[in-house]
Amino acid sequence: MDALLKEQLAEGESIIWQGVPEPFETLDKTNKKRFWITLAVCIAAAAALVVLYLANIKGEPKPAVLVIILVLCGFAPVRRFLYAAAVRKLRYLVTDRQLLIVSNEVKRVSLSRVKVCALRSDADGHLSFLAGAHALKARPSHWRDLALTGQPNTEPDEPVDSFAFYAVADKAGLRAVIRRVLPNVQM
């Protein structure tokens, strides 16, 4: 067990399930539409900003300003690919006390803070575990983001708001362990 994970486990706490995301396409059915909409909005925003800049400058245009506009507007569509690559490297763990997502950092939430959760599949058949009111309201095209950026509330007594295991490869194992460790949670 790596040192980063070992630090997150309490004395006597045991890992009862581990999983990883199953293989998925970056622009699958669930995420393709969001990518194209984001790309169209970014192109329109970049064009509008360039036109505004060129219309309001006095003297010669500064190429650096144009480059900054294009780079900033180009980041949003590229982010879909960066997030997909990052999700592929995640490890999901369930212990007898908490849920963990391990990458270059560890995100965790105590099982006692999970008040609502669901196992849901997207249009591509990828099963994801969603915990918290915000996660349950999220569209399937946002589930990858939740696995990377979903934040449990910082208050120890507050229920988790947004936590997700995206596209779990071991579907049967995840279903069984969730029923076991969260038997009283609304699913």
Cite the ranges covered by each PLM segment.
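A membrane-cytosol interface segment of integral membrane proteins
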Residues: 126-187
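Acidic, Ser/Thr-rich low-complexity segments on the non-lumenal side of membrane proteins
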Residues: 102-143
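Soluble N-terminal interaction domains of secretory/endomembrane membrane proteins
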Residues: 11, 86, 184-187
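Conserved beta-hairpin
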Residues: 75-115
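Alpha-helical transmembrane spans
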Residues: 24-90
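Short, charged cytosolic
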Residues: 1-21
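Short, exposed beta-strand/loop patches in secreted or surface proteins that constitute
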Residues: 8, 92, 116-120
